[in-house]
Curated annotation (Swiss-Prot):
The gene is mtnA. Residues 362-371 have a biased composition (Acidic residues). Pathway: Amino-acid biosynthesis; L-methionine biosynthesis via salvage pathway; L-methionine from S-methyl-5-thio-alpha-D-ribose 1-phosphate: step 1/6. The record marks 157 as: Transition state stabilizer. This is Methylthioribose-1-phosphate isomerase. Residues 354-378 are annotated as: Disordered. GO terms for molecular function: S-methyl-5-thioribose-1-phosphate isomerase activity. Substrate binds at residues 47-49, 87, 196, 247-248. The active site is at 237 (proton donor).
Amino acid sequence: MDDHIRFDHQTFELHLLDQRLLPAQEADFVCRSVEDVVYALQTMVVRGAPAIGVTAAWGCVLALREAQGPDWAARLEQGMERIAAARPTAVNLRWAVERMRGVWLAAGGEAGDPAPLLTAFAHAAQTMQDEDVAVCKTLGRHGAACIEDGDCVLTHCNAGALATAGYGTALGVIRAAVEAGKKVSVIADETRPFLQGARLTAWELERDGIPVTVACDNACALLMSRGLVQRVVVGADRIAANGDTANKIGTYGVALLARHFHIPFYVAAPLSTIDPATPDGAGIPIEERPELEVTHMGETRLCPENVPVLNFAFDVTPAEYISGIITEKGVLYPPYGLSIWAALNDLSTGRSAGISAGPLRDEDDAPDAEPDWSRERS
């Protein structure tokens, strides 16, 4: 799947596979303006941190295209900020806009010529999209070493090709394990209220021929207690400098259950999802979404009128519950403050920095003696 984010250079239109309609219908949502991109981001036409970032980059191309006249620089800045503020939790959104801003500054900033800048913007956005696919495949190969032949992997939400420019993060790990010849099956929990697991993860894996079963969110404890889950792999929307991880609401509960049942819990995310400016999870903004997502199923209202609704889109899993963070640089292990810093600064890729190209097998080798949860399973 490599055409769910597609920019038409002839018409200057951004085509996004409308994920709200899956799996019943495959149709594109076409963005012709900054406001179209913001709408697509906010209504989850497109979702998933890396995919949001790539969409934002192409949105900046549209912002520049709209910014005509003597005040083009001010209008471009306004459009880019509008995109960057569309959703608060996924750090890739701001990261992508700032990367495009760097292209602008390199071309002379406000003193530059907007005509050649448009070509530079389009090239930068395409480069970002291509890089994300390559990063996901590299990340997947590192993460595949964490999956054993015969494992059943539980995943939450959708961190697959749809959530990235292609291949996926959590699902990229599963895809890479299957490509390496391992027999892997998946339990996709439904992920209320937007049902990304039931609608999107199951759709992706079924198309790939990877065995997948959908389970209710509240069945997780039972599944683990019966030994039906050997690994958990999830994606991330923002990772703090200490390893605390924001992901789809419900992830924290899955992590707590995994710890209780001694099941390894991995986060798979590119380094662009790490926010070194946020020391810990307390500083990660948590998006609240419309009540309608909870109160209605399609056009049918499920809840009584006038009953308040809480619809937090994300929660934060403390780093202490994460067995490893799978990145394109390798698998990061505790202490995450050190291993994240080393990975971001392109320093050691050795175990002394808490980074490994595969899972640590000996507890004595693990930085700060991260437990090997698989050894404690009964």
